[in-house]
Amino acid sequence: NYRIFAPEIPDQIDFAGEPAPLHLVTVREKLDRELLINTYWHTSTLTLMKRANRYFPMIESILREHNIPDDFKYLALVESRLENVISPRGATGFWQFLKETAREYGLEVNLEVDERYDPEKSTVAACEYLKKAFSEYQNWTLVAASYNGGNRRIGEAVEEQNTTDYYELWLNEETSRYIYRILAVKTIFQNPTRYGFYLTPSDLYPEIPSEEIRVEKDIPDLMAFADSLGIFRLILNKIKPL
């Protein structure tokens, strides 16, 4: 008989070295909710595991270079599923930058170039945001929450509610779930078989080999450009989305 089991809630867990207070019933239940969703939404979680193998090494390297905790790679996973998606508000790329914020943190965004689509450059820009936010909050959990809820809103919530503890703050639905979503994904990724996910190395998506090509003029037809270099069109579009 096919049986469905409740996913195991870990005895302890932390985000960026900052422990989550799992002894509190509300905290355990919120984490349980996200573990249930990610454990039994098999197609989604399996796809994320496969895709992370392609992009996590690059993200981890840049995070280390900028002294950002490794757990922030899961933030990118939750933000965009490591895809160059566009939100209804226009947030774009792995790290879901709005145009104004992207420019503020050094990304070129105009009619011809949009570096939000560049996984490496956008990761560097995200690190700059995270470092600036940490200089204000001195708390990585609040930094992650501010990435979702906005620096101003989190700052106002901290001041009005007189606490710097994310787990005590009253926030909107999305931001109040945000850290728990990250913790759930982290828990499953670190213990996949415990949650029923079995993957072999051959199941994982490999890195797409690439090289930098400098051009001296505009490229009016990217598909023709791909053909001229003998590059598979869909591969080029994945690296440089239209």
Question: Each predicted region: which residue ranges?
Answer:
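Primarily a LysM-type cell-wall glycan-binding module
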Residues: P201-G230
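Substrate-binding/active-site groove segments that recognize
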Residues: G90-L111, T123-A125, L130, I154-A157
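Short, functionally critical alpha-helical segments immediately adjacent to catalytic or ligand/cofactor-binding
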Residues: I68-E83, V143-G149, L236-K240
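Extracytoplasmic
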Residues: P10, N67-K73, L77, T92, ...
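Catalytic and binding regions of secreted/periplasmic enzymes and modules that target cell-wall glycans
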Residues: L130-A157
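Catalytic cores of secreted or luminal carbohydrate-active enzymes
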Residues: T175-Y195, I231
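An acidic, Gly/Ser/Thr/Pro-rich helix-cap/linker signature
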Residues: N1-N67
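Solvent-exposed, acidic/flexible segments
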Residues: W41, T45-F56, E65-I68, S87-W95, ...
